[in-house]
Amino acid sequence: MKVVFAGTPGFARVALQRLLDAGFSLPLVLTRPDQPAGRGLQWQASPVKQCALAHGLAVAQPRSLRLDGRYPQDAAAARAALLAAQAEVMVVAAYGLILPQWVLDLPARGCLNIHASLLPRWRGAAPIQRAIEAGDTHTGVTIMQMDAGLDTGAMLLSQGSAIAPTDTTATLHDRLAALGADLIVQALEKMAAGADLPALAQPAQGVAYARKIEKSESSIDWSLPAQRIGQRIRAFDPAPGASTTCNGTSIKLWGYAIDGATIDGQRGVPRMHPGQILSADDSGIAVACGQGTALRLTVLQRAGGKRLAAADFLRGFALQPGMWLGAARA
C-alpha cells in the first residue's frame, strides 16, 4: 500500500518512523517549510523532514495547499507531486497546514489523522496541553477519517492512556506519540488486508476545543487555586513554560508540590495574599494562592539560566517570606 505522509514536529516523526519500520511504501512526505530556530536563528528542517531525508524519501514543503490562496504555485506543485505519488491513503499527524477539499478527495481511501485525544474531547491544535491544564486524568489517541471540519471526522480506532499527576506535556506527548504510531500502523494493516474498519461518527456530547497555546498564557495568575496553577505548570512544560516575576526579574516555573496546609490554617503565620511568599528554604518556595491554598515551587529557572532545584536557585536569588511574585503590589 502506498502512503503519503504529512506531518511536521516530533510527534509526527515517531509515526513516520513506525510506518517505515512496518514496511509501508512512502513515495512522498509533506512537511512545513524550514524555520529559523535557536539563538542563532539558523534555518532548521522539521523533525519529519530530517527523518524523511535520512531514509531517502521525497519531500515537499509547500507554504500552502490552497490553489486559490497566497501561494498558488506551491499548491500546484504539491498537487502535481501528490498525483505522481499515486498513494491510496494519506496519513496526517500535526502537519500544521489546513487540507483543502481537493487534498481530502485525492487519495482513494482518503486522509487519516492521528489526533492526540479521545475525540470529541479536545478537538484542535493543543489537545495534550489542554488535557493537562484542565486536570483530566485520562486521554488517548484517535485515528480519524478526515473531513472538512476541525477534527470532526469519523473515528476508526482509538485507545486511552492515563494522565499521571506528575505528567507534563513533554512526558505525555512521548507516550501518545508512540501510541498513535502503533494505532496508525494497525489501521493501515487492516486496510491493506481488506479487513473491516468501522467508521464511527463522533458523538454530539462531550465536545471540547483545544485552542492553540498563546505565550501570554504562560504568566501565572496567583489568585487561582494551587491545584490549577500546578496544572498550568505541567501543561506549559516544555513550552512556553509557566512564568512569574519577582522585582522585575522573570522566573520560569518547572516543578512544584501542593502544600497540604491552607494559608489561614498555619499556626503563627499571618494571613498572606495570593502571590506572597510564605517561606523559602531548601524544600522549596511556598507561595500563597487563591482560595486559601499554597504551592511549593521546587524547580525554577532565571532568564538565560538552567533549571535548578529550589535549594540551588535560592543560592543565587534571595527570596524571603513576604516578598511578592507576579504583578507589583502597593
Curated annotation (Swiss-Prot):
Positions with a binding annotation for (6S)-5,6,7,8-tetrahydrofolate: S117, L118, L119, P120
Keywords: Protein biosynthesis, Transferase
Pfam family, any one: Formyl_trans_N
Cellular component terms (Gene Ontology): cytosol
Entry EC number(s): 2.1.2.9
Catalytic activity as recorded in UniProt: L-methionyl-tRNA(fMet) + (6R)-10-formyltetrahydrofolate = N-formyl-L-methionyl-tRNA(fMet) + (6S)-5,6,7,8-tetrahydrofolate + H(+)
Example of a GO MF term: methionyl-tRNA formyltransferase activity
Family affiliation: Belongs to the Fmt family.
NCBIfam families documented for this protein: fmt (TIGR00460)
Described purpose of this protein according to its UniProt entry: Attaches a formyl group to the free amino group of methionyl-tRNA(fMet). The formyl group appears to play a dual role in the initiator identity of N-formylmethionyl-tRNA by promoting its recognition by IF2 and preventing the misappropriation of this tRNA by the elongation apparatus.
Alphabetical list of PANTHER family matching this protein: METHIONYL-TRNA FORMYLTRANSFERASE, METHIONYL-TRNA FORMYLTRANSFERASE, MITOCHONDRIAL
Official protein name in the record: Methionyl-tRNA formyltransferase
Organism of derivation: Verminephrobacter eiseniae (strain EF01-2)
